[in-house]
Amino acid sequence: MTQQNGKGLEIKEKFPFVDYILGTHNIGDLRSLLSGGAGGVFVEDTDGYINDDLPVTRTSMPNAWVNIIYGCNNFCTYCIVPYVRGRERSRTMDSVKAEVERLVKEGYKEITLLGQNVNSYGHDLNDGTTFAKLLNLLADIPGKFRLR
């Protein structure tokens, strides 16, 4: 929730002893924030930003999971996802394709595409990207593997 507009300031006001405030979208910035030594830093949502450069450790050969969309726009009564993860943010098709290609080259055989609602993939990109187009693109990757 801290990445949502205004939440970082609200937390800082209520808990002034907290040195760093950042949300799940900014976990990749943690090292640079800590090494910079600047206390009182908080990072709010950066409109659709997705850090594709985070290191991934996979220990589930031959299965791999690939996030294609983060967040949710549904705000179901019983669910906290939109409040914690924010609104839907899709990765680009090129980014997803590159990750799946790497996985196939590394020998992964079953690749599961992840998201709270994968059918919403691409709607936020406003460039005609759809889940169906992503599936067609990934189906053209050479190699023996299964998409789920």
PLM-predicted stretches and their roles:
Residues M1-Y121, N136:
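Proteins enriched for Cys/Gly/acidic motifs involved in redox and nucleic-acid/cofactor modification
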Residues D124:
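Active-site core of PLP-dependent enzymes with the aminotransferase class I/II
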Residues D127-R148:
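Alpha-helix-loop-beta-strand connector modules within alpha/beta enzyme cores
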